[in-house]
Amino acid sequence: MAFLFKKIIRLIKTYFIIVGFLTTLFLSLGIFLLLSSEHYFDSKSFITVPHLKGDKLIHLRWSGTLHDSQTESSPFDIVLSNGLDLEGDFYIPHMETYLKELGDDHEVKGLVIELGHLEGGLAVLSELRDVLKNFKKRTQKPIYFWFTHGDTKSYYLASVGDEILMAPGHKLLLLGPMVNSIYFGDALKRLGVNIEVLKTGTYKSAFEPFVSNEPSEASIFMYDEFIKSVKENLIQDLSQSLPQLTRDALEKAFKTSIIESEEAVKAHLITQVSYFHEAKSKYETFHKAKLQRYSDYVLTKSRKQKESPSYLEEDEKGIALIEAIGTITDSFDDSMDQSLNPHSIIKEIHWAKEDKNVKAVVMRVNSPGGSATASDLIWEELRLLALEKPLVVSMGDVAASGGYYISAPAHKIFANANTITGSIGVISMIANFKNFKEKYGISFFLHSDSDRKDLFDMGKEASEADKEFLKMQSDKTYHDFISK
């Protein structure tokens, strides 16, 4: 009986494996056929992708994890991959191949790379940096970088570019290398867990967090050497790519750590502060070429030029509806539920602005707010839309803080009697877990030479200087809010 039961279970598992494989295969083929059809439609705003003939600049969006080896991917990852337009995993050898293809296309006059948050080690990032340097050397084509929040990794990569642009009101976070650890020594003892570590070698510290409440002297020495070495490599590479920056200037930037975009220009860390549409206009004018998303370039490069049809019929006029729903985030991820990121809604705003059959726009706002910087990016695009077409906002249950911010460019704003709106201000929170050690035996450790290191150490209370710094940032954001 037991044998028969196991056999039945095995047959059921085999059945589901086969069904799952076939389902994935047919769905993948369906997606492939959809992407191979004559026109590609965005799922929300039905944006069609015309063939762009003539000189072009390629717009890439990079945000995700860097890999030096090809990770396991599902059939969906393979079918839906856009090659260089990455918001997930970066596989360096593939990127090198795709960049070579762009370099060999005489119509491609340069790259405009929009950087998001990059995950991965500096070694892999350095390899990607070398790939971009080789692209420039081989093709003599420029690379321009634009980002909102720049950090050490994105800035390090962007330093090989011909220009580095940053959105207004954002911050450059040059924290440099740091070590941040949590220690569970006392916590595990209180739980009745006794751990013995057997090691050979002074600097074998992998299990210290499970037996101690703080790093050993050997570990601190090792962390110091690590930080010095990595920081020295960063400064050397940045100095070579950005000759206008002295070693002292870079040391100061890493010490200051949090730098306003406008201050970054004054310090010659970046080229210019601008919204993306301003950067687009600048480079299109300079190169006499049109900016095209890489994903659109891939879909259309082998097609004959066709006029892009509108979602509306040729003689049909209409009003576009844009939905701004959810918490406003800085994420590039369009798939996050109950969130509103600038990248997805800006695509819809561009469609509504550029489609000649769209005569007006209604935007439904149901958002409690969120990121001030992301709200500002949306606000700017809506401001430009309102210069060309009537824009009306209809507020739902809530349009507070950032939700009100993005509503401001509208010619008319309508709210229900029960709509919760307003909340014009800026709020932030500082949490510390210094009492965790006494209550739970959990300790936090952060090792860095940044002047702002306490802000990132969960085991310490923020200093008065840090609180004053954050208050100044909050006041500036508030002033920008009410001025718009």
Kindly give the residue locations of the regions a language model identified.
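Small-residue-centered hinge/linker elements
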Residues: 2-247, 252-255, 284-389, 393, ...
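Amphipathic alpha-helical
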Residues: 276-278, 282
